[in-house]
């Protein structure tokens, strides 16, 4: 049998059940389509992928290209609409099977289903490769409720077993492709090699034993695990991290901090299956329950939030870090999201869209699910979250070092550039 293996968010050889399934046949082609629609702008003026995340993804693709070459394979990288690009391949080459990691985001599910309908004579196989649990483990879970309910429903279900890295692959099938991976140096290196090096270096320290105390910081050495960019691109799997965490606990002991790392992997898991169940509702203004929030979209307010030019210097510092680096702490994300929804009264989707563009560790289900959570249209039984911005600044930046690092000049005195009559109001100092 001849198999076409389609890469999505599984850019690695190690612990890749989808690749293992594809490698059982006699001939194999490995392909990845860069969706060109990600580089267009939506109604909020945001791209589906900005230059910082694109650089990290290019680095990840280059790393995988080199790893596959060592096994005698070419990573065929193409650009366009995934549905059209893959349909063209299937029309012009003979394949018996198409394999990919199971999709959880509505767009990926849609083009996959359309291909299945278009090519009924080909077997289409999805494999759980980006989650801790398989589809059978969560099939009875209810994703309209809380995360706590999801955890209870999982019960004692075991994590997916680690899959060995393949030593060989079937004979390669050549396709036409273009190599478009020429990354420039960045602050974070993408790819499975860099991801595994980071995994090793993190657990070589004792940072995991104090993670619960540092996780809410805005910055600092090893205050966060740093796994999220590699998870989002599939350079690391959550099972790899969970297994290394278990080894660390055996060597150094388990505590609240080590348990919290697994707890946050479970949050990611929850949002993956939440996104798969709710489909288009993940992106709906009214969320999963059809309750429209009392917010709207003001371009000027959005611009000021995006550029870090609001009356709150803690928000400004966070937004400027995000704009320049593509990174932002978990606490920082909650602060700026609460500001956009509650203080600025903006449509939560414009914030989620900007995060989509900027974040190196962008994960569709986690990003949009968390924004729904803050906006009160998602899985939060409390109906949204509203943070006191002054209190957040006092708690997490008491010495103002973070704000001093990212903010120059005085914060804006108002949330609008113009008053009711259209006259300019006070702006931030240059």
Predicted ranges, named:
Residues 8-10, 33, 80, 103-105, ...:
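An acidic- and aromatic-residue-enriched active-site/binding cleft used to recognize and process polar
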Residues 82-193, 372-374, 390, 404:
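Beta-rich, aromatic/charged-enriched effector core domains that present basic-aromatic interfaces
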Residues 15-18, 111-112, 351:
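Residues at alpha-helix caps and immediate loop-helix transition turns in enzyme cores, especially N-
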Residues 223-412:
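Active-site-proximal binding-pocket segments
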Residues 1-72, 425-430:
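N-terminal beta-strand-loop-alpha-helix module at the start
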Residues 141-289, 393-430:
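Glycine/tryptophan-enriched, flexible segments
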Residues 29, 74-78, 123-127:
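General small-molecule cofactor/ligand-binding pocket signal
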